[in-house]
């Protein structure tokens, strides 16, 4: 059933919007409330190439995309604060744990759609129908091919072994990608073993955590460490860089997709869902369907080097090279359910 804002709720939304600093959007203003020609997108994805998807959607449907872009935690807090008066129609977060938290807070709601169900595999859809994956990224190991053999980094466990004492680079524990990885390890191994692993990682750090994933790969290429934890697509971006030095270092670095218990590598997910009080529900559903279509899925693969969630998307050669890697079939609810435990383990292990 389409929910409609009451006059009081609409007034509340207007007052809230007036009290807030405007956020950048694809139309140059704030997201608005109900409008038959608009879909209001709240997104934590920060990729400029996503704008091409919004433009393609508008061209195909005539519906404009009004966007508010914020980091996931701020986006969730804004939705909480806006409550029933929120103008949000669609919520997109680049991390499965963030989507899970939004779902548990009631900020996105279950909906049924045959198109999405047919396109997106069941294991990439929330069991309660609240959200689904739109793109996937693997948490992999970048390693120095001159000093590390592939079989030495074919599991996550090996990264915590004495073999790599003082030879590992990794970013800080407050990064959502590391949080989701540790959440997956807790789900698969249990808390005690995951804590032991995190302590091993801290003992193996070549330097205090610093920089983003690209900086970890560059550190491997520069000989500052032998192995690093990163998302797969950052390596592909360096390989395609206009900077010759970046392209050159990728000839000395390779990727391993480590396995968890023989089931496959950890993949994190960008997800999308229907906002709880969407004033433009019909437009929202059309936009959500569009995200699973061939044009959007091919854009994720070709522009951000992510793995699509739908079969048949056009893949560039570098993404296609890794597309067959096995993925740990982690249940979607586990990403969010284990995050509090993961944060506690990071603190206990001294992973800053």
Where are these regions (language model features)?
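A structural signal for short loop-to-beta-strand junctions that line the ligand-binding cleft
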Residues: 86-91, 109-141, 157, 167-170
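A bilobed periplasmic-binding-protein/Venus flytrap-type ligand-binding module shared by bacterial periplasmic
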Residues: 140-147, 267-280, 299-302
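Short beta-strand->loop
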Residues: 42-45, 127-128, 143-145, 151, ...
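C-terminal motif of bacterial Sec signal peptides marking the signal peptidase cleavage site
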Residues: 16-19
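Ligand-binding pocket segment of bilobal, Venus flytrap-like solute-binding proteins
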Residues: 173, 177, 184-258
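Early extracytoplasmic/lumenal segment of secretory-pathway proteins
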Residues: 21-100, 352
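An extracytoplasmic/periplasmic, membrane-proximal ligand-sensing/linker region
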Residues: 194, 305-352
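Periplasmic-binding protein-like
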Residues: 166-174, 290-314
């Amino acid at each position: 059933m389409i929910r409609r804002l009451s006059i009081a709720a609409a007034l509340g939304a207007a007052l809230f919007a007036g009290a807030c600093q405007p956020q950048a959007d694809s139309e140059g203003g704030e997201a608005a409330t109900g409008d038959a020609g608009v879909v209001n997108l709240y997104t934590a994805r920060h990729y400029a190439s996503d704008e091409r998807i919004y433009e393609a959607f508008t061209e195909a449907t005539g519906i404009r995309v009004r966007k508010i872009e914020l980091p996931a935690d701020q986006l969730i807090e804004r939705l909480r604060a806006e409550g029933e008066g929120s103008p949000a129609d669609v919520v997109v977060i680049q991390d499965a744990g963030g989507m899970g938290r939004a779902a548990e807070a009631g900020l996105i709601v279950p909906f049924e759609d045959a198109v999405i169900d047919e396109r997106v595999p069941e294991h990439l859809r929330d069991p309660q129908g609240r959200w689904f994956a739109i793109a996937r990224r693997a948490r992999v190991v970048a390693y120095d091919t001159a000093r590390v053999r592939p079989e030495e980094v074919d599991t996550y466990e090996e990264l915590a072994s004495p073999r790599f004492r003082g030879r590992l680079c990794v970013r800080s524990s407050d990064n959502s990608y590391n949080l989701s990885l540790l959440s997956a390890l807790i789900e698969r191994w249990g808390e005690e073993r995951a804590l032991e692993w995190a302590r091993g990682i801290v003992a193996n750090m070549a330097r205090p955590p610093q920089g983003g994933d690209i900086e970890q790969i560059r550190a491997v290429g520069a000989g500052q460490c032998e192995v690093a934890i990163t998302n797969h697509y950052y390596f592909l971006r360096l390989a395609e860089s206009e900077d010759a030095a970046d392209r050159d270092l990728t000839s000395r670095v390779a990727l391993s997709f480590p396995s968890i218990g023989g089931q496959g590598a950890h993949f994190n997910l960008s997800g999308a869902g229907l906002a709880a009080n969407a004033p433009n529900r019909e437009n929202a559903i059309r936009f959500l369907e569009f995200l699973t279509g061939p044009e959007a899925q091919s854009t994720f693969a070709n522009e951000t080097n992510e793995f699509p969630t739908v079969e048949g998307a056009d893949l560039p050669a570098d993404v296609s090279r890794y597309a067959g890697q096995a993925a740990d079939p982690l249940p979607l609810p586990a990403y969010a359910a284990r995050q509090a435990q993961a944060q506690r383990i990071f603190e206990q292990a001294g992973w800053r």
